[in-house]
């Protein structure tokens, strides 16, 4: 074989070798691109899953908080029906005490029983609303009638007909009240 044919053969072999290398490089680039694309897809999916997980955890915390509030409210206000019955009994005891005279042993016994019931109600978050002298508040009071009284600001509670009650700062029964108003002839002076 001549040198020129050896040279041609060598050039041809180099060219084939380069093409194989280029093809291999091209395949490697394609595989790398495919792997990068797969990696990016997986990263996006991981971000989506993390977001879903965060939302699920937040939803779970919200549900837990709501349930705890409902349980707390249920225990706080479970005594509401009993409390309403008890305050009716307190009203009856008050009426009896108003009829009986101070110093009467029955009056004193009823007074002690009444005070015991009121103290027990307080232990459970039930408080009396005695708004005498305060301004009328429709959230806590029920106006029954207005009475002329030029000495007090209009809308001031001048008499409490029935004591109101709250349970843990929530109205159980409004106080029934009489309000002051200016007399009709007061405005003509």
Swiss-Prot record:
<keyword id="KW-0143">Chaperone</keyword>
<dbReference type="InterPro" id="IPR000740">
    <property type="entry name" value="GrpE"/>
</dbReference>
<keyword id="KW-0346">Stress response</keyword>
<comment type="function">
    <text>Participates actively in the response to hyperosmotic and heat shock by preventing the aggregation of stress-denatured proteins, in association with DnaK and GrpE. It is the nucleotide exchange factor for DnaK and may function as a thermosensor. Unfolded proteins bind initially to DnaJ; upon interaction with the DnaJ-bound protein, DnaK hydrolyzes its bound ATP, resulting in the formation of a stable complex. GrpE releases ADP from DnaK; ATP binding to DnaK triggers the release of the substrate protein, thus completing the reaction cycle.</text>
</comment>
<comment type="similarity">
    <text>Belongs to the GrpE family.</text>
</comment>
<dbReference type="Pfam" id="PF01025">
    <property type="entry name" value="GrpE"/>
</dbReference>
<dbReference type="InterPro" id="IPR009012">
    <property type="entry name" value="GrpE_head"/>
</dbReference>
<protein>
    <recommendedName>
        <fullName>Protein GrpE</fullName>
    </recommendedName>
</protein>
<feature type="compositionally biased region" description="Basic and acidic residues">
    <location>
        <begin position="17"/>
        <end position="33"/>
    </location>
</feature>
<feature type="region of interest" description="Disordered">
    <location>
        <begin position="1"/>
        <end position="37"/>
    </location>
</feature>
<dbReference type="InterPro" id="IPR013805">
    <property type="entry name" value="GrpE_coiled_coil"/>
</dbReference>
<keyword id="KW-0963">Cytoplasm</keyword>
<dbReference type="GO" id="GO:0042803">
    <property type="term" value="F:protein homodimerization activity"/>
</dbReference>
<dbReference type="GO" id="GO:0006457">
    <property type="term" value="P:protein folding"/>
</dbReference>
<dbReference type="GO" id="GO:0000774">
    <property type="term" value="F:adenyl-nucleotide exchange factor activity"/>
</dbReference>
<dbReference type="GO" id="GO:0051082">
    <property type="term" value="F:unfolded protein binding"/>
</dbReference>
<comment type="subunit">
    <text>Homodimer.</text>
</comment>
<dbReference type="GO" id="GO:0005737">
    <property type="term" value="C:cytoplasm"/>
</dbReference>
<dbReference type="GO" id="GO:0051087">
    <property type="term" value="F:protein-folding chaperone binding"/>
</dbReference>
């Amino acid at each position: 074989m001549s040198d020129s044919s050896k040279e041609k053969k060598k050039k041809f072999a180099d060219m084939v070798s380069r093409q194989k290398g280029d093809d291999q490089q091209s395949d490697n680039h394609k595989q790398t691109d495919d792997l990068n694309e797969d990696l990016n897809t997986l990263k996006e999916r991981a971000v989506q899953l993390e977001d879903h997980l965060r939302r699920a955890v937040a939803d779970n915390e919200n549900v837990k908080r709501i349930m705890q509030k409902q349980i707390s409210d249920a225990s706080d206000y479970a005594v509401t029906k009993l409390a309403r019955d008890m305050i009716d009994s307190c009203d009856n005891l008050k009426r009896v005490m108003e009829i009986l005279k101070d110093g009467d042993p029955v009056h004193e016994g009823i007074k002690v029983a009444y005070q015991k019931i009121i103290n027990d109600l307080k232990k459970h978050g039930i408080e009396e609303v005695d708004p005498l002298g305060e301004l009328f508040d429709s959230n806590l009071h029920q106006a029954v009638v207005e009475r002329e009284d030029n000495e007090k600001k209009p809308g001031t509670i001048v008499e409490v007909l029935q004591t109101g009650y709250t349970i843990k700062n929530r109205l159980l029964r409004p106080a029934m009240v009489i309000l002051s108003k200016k007399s009709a002839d007061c405005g003509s002076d």
